[in-house]
């Protein structure tokens, strides 16, 4: 085969429908906060393959919605539901522990289409609910004070059948906040997941946190922030109300510390990281003598060599 034939796009094998689907799915699942609809629209026009597009969308949207922990309003306006793996009952049903309701979700449209009461099997015992409800109440107050457009939820992810003291159980507290301002060319989100283990045998409560911050600025450029942080803390096992106050205080402290560290690192970015990216000396290891550039007259050197 000639070189011309190798470079000819017509001679190159086209992507299969499955390959197109996988590529489209990757772009959709990696969309910046609040931008998946716009990216889906562009992908649809580029693919020109409706089957591959529909397959990619049906797989990518649920993953994106759970990863970004999007918040959807319940159809009866009794509250909101966070789309998380902790509240996932099946592919389209998600539990809202606060209202004891299960929402049916259309992932692609990102709306709740139906709601039903949660069954007893889907809810924790009254003993666990005391701890879950107390923490949820404290977390709601913290999120309202800290995040202008934030939502939170607390789930029992282990030991929901525990009837009383003497056994261990685990809660998961999630916080999701986002700000979408495409007219100002910026979108961002904050997500934090807190696994809280109540160890009755040790009379201790252990906290493990995973924090993620995403931001996208795209005015006359394309700048993205993707920052992650993990942390741990612990407190003593107390009453539901006292545990809730202590846990929320630890969450507040850890999140404020991380935000302060982010602000400090990016404030110093121009004077540290960006400066280090520049080559301190050219490849000749000699500074260019800008004060005496006449000695580098190209015209004069050429004339001398040619004897002009």
How would you label these PLM feature ranges?
Residues 4-10, 14, 38, 49, ...:
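C-terminal/domain-edge helix-coil "capping" segments
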Residues 14, 18, 25-26, 31:
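Terminal, non-globular segments
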Residues 19-24, 36, 53:
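Short amphipathic alpha-helical segments that mediate assembly, nucleic-acid/protein binding
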Residues 36-43, 75:
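Amphipathic alpha-helical elements of HEAT/ARM-like alpha-solenoid repeat scaffolds that form extended
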Residues 40, 44, 132, 136, ...:
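Residue-level detector of alpha-helical secondary structure
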Residues 46-150:
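Long amphipathic alpha-helical scaffold segments
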Residues 133, 137, 145, 150-224:
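Surface-exposed short loop/turn segments
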């Amino acid at each position: 085969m000639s070189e011309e034939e190798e470079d000819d796009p017509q001679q190159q094998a086209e992507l299969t429908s499955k390959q197109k689907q996988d590529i489209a799915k990757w772009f959709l699942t990696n969309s910046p906060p609040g931008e998946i609809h716009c990216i889906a629209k562009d992908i649809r026009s580029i693919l020109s393959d409706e089957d591959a597009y529909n397959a990619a969308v049906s797989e990518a949207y649920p993953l994106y919605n759970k990863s970004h922990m999007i918040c959807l309003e319940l159809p009866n306006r009794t509250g909101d539901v966070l789309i998380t793996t902790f509240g996932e009952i099946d592919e389209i049903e998600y539990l809202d522990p606060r209202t004891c309701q299960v929402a049916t979700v259309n992932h692609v449209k990102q709306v709740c289409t139906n709601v039903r009461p949660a069954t007893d099997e889907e809810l924790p015992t009254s003993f666990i609910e005391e701890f879950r409800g107390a923490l949820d109440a404290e977390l709601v107050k913290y999120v309202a004070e800290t995040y202008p457009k934030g939502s939170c939820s607390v789930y029992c992810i282990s030991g929901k059948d525990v009837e009383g003291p003497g056994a261990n159980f685990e809660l998961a507290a999630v916080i999701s906040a986002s700000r979408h301002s495409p007219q100002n060319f910026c979108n961002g989100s904050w997500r934090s997941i807190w696994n809280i283990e109540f160890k009755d045998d040790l009379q201790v409560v252990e906290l493990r946190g995973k924090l993620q911050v995403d931001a996208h600025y795209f005015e006359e450029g394309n700048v993205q922030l993707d920052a992650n942080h993990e942390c741990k803390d612990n407190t003593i096992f107390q009453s539901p109300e006292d545990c809730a106050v202590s846990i929320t205080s630890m969450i507040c402290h850890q999140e404020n510390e991380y935000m302060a560290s982010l602000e400090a690192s990016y404030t110093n970015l121009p004077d540290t990281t960006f400066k280090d990216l520049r080559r301190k000396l050219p490849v000749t290891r000699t500074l260019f003598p800008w004060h005496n550039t006449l000695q580098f007259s190209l015209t004069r050197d050429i004339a001398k060599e040619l004897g002009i």
